[in-house]
């Protein structure tokens, strides 16, 4: 890993490093459709990772047919919005607009031709060397002279003013650059090597010159080897993203199917009045979430589930972690594998999401022998707990990536984090109040959801630094509570952005 101005130290505001990159593809023209001519193949392998346990992306042909039937234009939607957590390397480049008069024409001439669409990402033949997307904060749109309200109060106020709704204990732990509203936008670079991303960044910086100012960067990467697709605690991630109508044609069993307007503004299912130009854009929530992995592992060891003659101490530790998450590290849900991991189940996308928490031999409202009410995946997607069919309003498209190095031997031995690592959390939704913020505030942070006395989500639940108590983690005694003495996930801040369609950039933001 390169250590430069991107390296991250847990106790300071030095930043993380790993990578992504970009190459110009075509010349701009008057028509968006004709400007984005077919790209000559330059790849022999995808810039995306392929994790067997995650639902496959649709083929170009299938997605195009589905989009046509739903009147979606995948050539106008930025690629990261619908693709999900399949990036190999990714760099988040946060910037402010120093000179809007100079930036706007360059947005049209230098940035827009490089933006990677959904269609392009679906095939190796059309993927660029490095994918590029861009999104703007409310202050960024204001700097560009865009005064239309987008109909989302959380976005309009910015994440820093939303601290209390997220359970953050003030901004003490925040990266200083995220405090206030000084970040106007973010470039997302994605590729399969650091060198590609570094080249792309250098090229874009040269083109934009001093009309923007780099504020902060955070570099992420899929974890190495068999850990690809797993977050730093070790659990397989990205399994439960919904299937968006008009994009996914064959949802996996148990995969939630949501209207396009759950993610995209102005589409079917979006009930808020929006400016016409905002159609097919999406609100991007970015959160830098540090993970205290050695401390988490020590907690599991010290509080392992005890079943003499059934579980070894290590198995008891693994079971506690699985019940806190709601899945084993393989991705197998504890609702289907309640006592021991089942890697074959975890690796099978036709089975690893096919559950509702309903079992004929157990009362849904009281039984926690399989999956605790407080488990992370149950808190954030309650499934049958809220009745059937499942309410799809509060679904989000998650598109984050791990950042920071693997745990060192010294950290593991000391049970203490010395170098920051975590998740660069990204979610897309058409309504932050119904999406990310609802999941965090109303479900994860609510000690009385799904039922009174459940406790907070033991992974992401936050109470502004106050002590967190969780129940149901011991399968032999669901009334037993466990006090979490450490926040194993620490918010380092973030911002709310709007990811516009390509036509919105050319027709509104860049004029």
Where are these regions (language model features)?
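N-terminal secretory signal peptides that target proteins for export/translocation
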Residues: 1-3
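Cleavable N-terminal signal peptides of Sec/SRP-targeted secreted and luminal proteins
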Residues: 5-21
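Long, low-complexity, Ser/Thr/Gly/Pro-rich intrinsically disordered segments that act as flexible linkers
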Residues: 22-511
């Amino acid at each position: 890993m390169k250590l430069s101005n991107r390296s991250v130290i847990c106790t300071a505001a030095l930043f993380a490093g790993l990578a992504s990159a970009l190459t110009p593809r075509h010349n701009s023209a008057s028509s968006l459709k004709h400007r984005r001519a077919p790209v000559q193949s330059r790849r022999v392998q995808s810039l995306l990772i392929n994790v067997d346990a995650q639902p496959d992306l649709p083929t170009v042909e299938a997605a195009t047919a589905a989009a046509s039937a739903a009147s979606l234009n995948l050539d106008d939607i930025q690629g990261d919005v619908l693709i999900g957590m399949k990036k190999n390397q990714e760099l988040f480049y946060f910037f402010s607009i120093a000179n809007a008069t100079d930036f706007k024409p360059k947005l049209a001439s230098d940035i827009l031709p490089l933006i990677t669409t959904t269609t392009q990402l679906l095939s190796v033949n059309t993927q660029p060397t490095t994918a590029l997307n861009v999104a703007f904060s409310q202050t960024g749109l204001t700097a560009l002279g865009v005064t239309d309200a987008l109909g989302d109060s959380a976005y309009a106020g910015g994440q820093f003013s939303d601290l209390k709704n997220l359970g953050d204990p003030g901004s003490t732990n925040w990266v200083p650059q995220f405090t206030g509203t000084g970040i106007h936008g973010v470039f997302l670079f994605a590729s399969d090597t650091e060198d590609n991303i570094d080249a792309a960044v250098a090229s874009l910086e040269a083109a934009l010159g001093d009309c923007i100012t780099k504020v902060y960067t955070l570099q992420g990467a899929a974890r190495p080897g068999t850990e690809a697709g797993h977050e730093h605690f070790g659990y397989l991630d990205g399994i439960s993203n919904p299937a968006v109508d008009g994009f996914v044609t064959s949802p996996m069993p148990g995969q939630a199917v949501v209207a396009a307007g759950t993610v995209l503004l102005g589409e079917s299912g979006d009930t808020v009045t929006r400016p016409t130009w905002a159609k097919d854009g999406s609100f991007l929530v970015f959160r830098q979430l540090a993970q205290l992995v050695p401390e988490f592992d020590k907690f599991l060891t010290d509080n392992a589930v005890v079943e003499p003659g059934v579980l070894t101490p290590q198995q008891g530790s693994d079971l506690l972690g699985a019940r806190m998450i709601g899945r084993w590290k393989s991705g197998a849900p504890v609702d289907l594998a309640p006592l021991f991991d089942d890697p074959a189940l975890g690796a099978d996308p036709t089975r690893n999401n096919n559950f509702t928490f309903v079992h004929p031999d157990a009362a849904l409202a009281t039984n926690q022998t399989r999956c605790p009410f407080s488990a992370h995946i149950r808190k954030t997607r309650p499934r049958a707990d809220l009745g059937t069919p499942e309410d799809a309003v509060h679904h989000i498209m998650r598109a984050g990536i791990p950042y920071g190095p693997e745990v060192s031997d010294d950290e593991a031995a000391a049970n203490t984090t010395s170098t920051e690592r975590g998740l660069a959390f990204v979610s897309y939704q058409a309504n932050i109040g119904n999406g990310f913020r609802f999941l965090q505030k109303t479900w994860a942070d609510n000690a009385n959801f799904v039922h009174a006395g459940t406790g907070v989500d033991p992974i992401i639940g936050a109470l502004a630094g106050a002590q967190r108590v969780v129940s149901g983690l011991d399968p032999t005694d669901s009334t037993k509570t466990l006090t979490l003495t450490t926040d194993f996930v620490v918010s380092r801040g973030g911002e709310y952005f709007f990811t516009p369609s390509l036509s919105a950039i050319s027709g509104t933001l860049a004029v």
